Design a protein with these regions (language model features):
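Residue-level detector of conserved, function-critical positions
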Residues: 21-309
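C-terminal motif of bacterial Sec signal peptides marking the signal peptidase cleavage site
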Residues: 15-17
Length: 309
């Protein structure tokens, strides 16, 4: 399912290392752009710079470097976490087939004894022993038992107090809090994230719908696919056709089209036939009114397109 997640994990907060250089106000000179020749020393360099840190690989081993090529974590691990700010968080790494955690200087802070590991969120992280997941603290002490089939990262959303985590048990997904109390029952084939949303897309008995923070059904489980945008509209798929509804279950665009793309500015691109070309589509606003026949779409979608047919 293509579900829009509208914000990033709170652990990845700082992207300053990837911004374009700014002008020095004292000299009016633009600082030189760092040379990227250092990348030739590696077999692979992560294409996206996050938090001034990139993942690198050489001879089948991974490490971390900054955007100038300075080695931050030695290239000696079978895998290593990327996209984290080293001054904010520990990161997992894999060595000799096992997972552990490193600090910002590359020192081992939790030994390599686990079969899987997830990002540390606050004081806890999900780790795997055998075929089950549990949660440990920063002293490597067990906080929650190893009883879960799968586990994600604890996070704090708009309403999520206490912090919740998406976990799987008995083949079904639900949410627990940091005490292990079940908040959303293990009743779903799939669950998306709440984050800052009031609602969560959920799949039950093979069909998609939406629930709220109290597990109340907001949108019934009758759709083959759902995709929301800004908590205003939901693109729904049913029996091979697509349409748009809102969170009050009101039909905005009838479920009678082959492809619908949710766009910015409350607009939608509609393909009434299976032929998804520029010549066969048109634009509608949120009220279902025709905006344009799409003659200008190629230029328009260079900046406005969010989804591709």
């Amino acid at each position: 399912m293509k579900h829009i997640v509208l914000f990033s994990l709170f652990l990845s907060l700082n992207f300053l290392g990837c911004q374009s250089p700014t002008t020095d106000k004292k000299t009016n000179d633009v600082p030189p752009i760092p040379s990227e020749s250092w990348k030739a020393n590696y077999d692979w360099v992560e294409p996206i710079c996050e938090n001034n840190v990139v993942k690198v690989r050489k001879n089948h081993k991974f490490g971390l470097a900054d955007h100038n090529g300075k080695v931050l974590i030695p290239v000696e691990y079978e895998d290593i976490e990327s996209g984290v700010s080293l001054n904010l968080n520990w990161l997992w790494a894999k060595k000799d087939g096992k997972y552990g955690y490193l600090d910002e200087n590359g020192a081992v802070v939790i030994p390599f004894i686990y079969d899987g590991a997830k990002t540390f969120s606050g004081l806890m992280a999900a780790v795997k022993k055998g075929d089950k997941w549990g949660f440990i603290n920063r002293d490597a002490e067990e906080e929650l038992p190893f009883i879960y089939d799968e586990a994600e990262v604890f996070y704090q959303g708009k309403w999520l107090s206490p912090t919740l985590c998406l976990v799987k048990k008995g083949g079904k997904w639900g949410y627990i809090n940091t005490e292990g109390t079940v908040i959303i029952p293990f009743a779903y084939d799939e669950l998306d994230d709440f984050f800052t949303d009031d609602y969560c897309a959920a799949k039950k008995n093979g069909k998609w719908g939406y629930i709220d923070k109290n597990n109340k059904v907001i949108i019934p489980f009758i759709y083959d696919e759902v995709e929301d945008y800004d908590l205003k509209y939901i693109r729904v798929v049913k029996d091979g056709k697509e349409g748009i509804i809102d969170f009050n279950r009101k039909t905005v665009i009838p479920i009678d089209f082959y492809v619908i793309n949710l766009l910015g500015d409350d607009a939608m691109r509609i393909f009434p036939t299976k032929e998804t070309t520029i010549e066969t589509c048109f634009l509608l606003d949120s009220l279902g009114n025709c905006i344009d026949g799409c003659e200008y779409i190629p230029e328009y979608y260079k900046t406005h397109k969010l989804f591709y047919p």
